[in-house]
Amino acid sequence: MGNCAKRPWRRGPKDPLQWLGSPPRGSCPSPSSSPKEQGDPAPGVQGYSVLNSLVGPACIFLRPSIAATQLDRELRPEEIEELQVAFQEFDRDRDGYIGCRELGACMRTLGYMPTEMELIEISQQISGGKVDFEDFVELMGPKLLAETADMIGVRELRDAFREFDTNGDGRISVGELRAALKALLGERLSQREVDEILQDVDLNGDGLVDFEEFVRMMSR
């Protein structure tokens, strides 16, 4: 596939929101929302909705009117670096490749939410079941250009994750989740509701939320 140095990708500027400041715009719910205020959502939706609203400041929105005029500019060095950071986040064995299974989550950290069909089609085009960084840039370049809203950057997601992971062990425990929710929502959530939120987000059932589960939660 092509060389990113020879064919730099382009996309529009980003406008980050302030941490827990003014009400978020676009698709991110207000931090003041609670499950009780949203009726009786389907199982699994409530936890994602509450945590997603709390991490609303991690959402980065592209202004469509500006993006439309910026599609022809070259991708800046810091934007190439952002791709590198996202890639390295999921290159766990540091061999310079990420597998098809990690590719979807990696794409989500950059704000692109691939469908299952898209992931299947991509996996069929990947030789050897894995991609290197050059292939990743080749793949994500056009998608980053096409995105005009709801962009979530890996650095912002990592910063938001650290707000919950207070002991820095790379996982969010029940206690850490309870403390974060209490600090942000006061006493509006019961112990049972906190446990239900953790259960909804904890995909592998180990009682903890790791960064990949956190990314998937933010993609819902």
From Swiss-Prot:
The keyword Cytoplasm applies. A lipid is attached at G2 (N-myristoyl glycine). Retina. Keywords: Calcium, Cell membrane, Cytoplasm, Deafness, Disease variant, Golgi apparatus, Hearing, Lipoprotein, Membrane, Metal-binding, Myristate, Non-syndromic deafness, Repeat, Sensory transduction, Vision. It is a lipid-anchor. Residues 22-35 have a biased composition (Low complexity). Residues 1-45 are annotated as: Disordered. Ca(2+) 2 binds at D165, N167, D169, R171, E176. This is Calcium-binding protein 2. It comes from Homo sapiens.
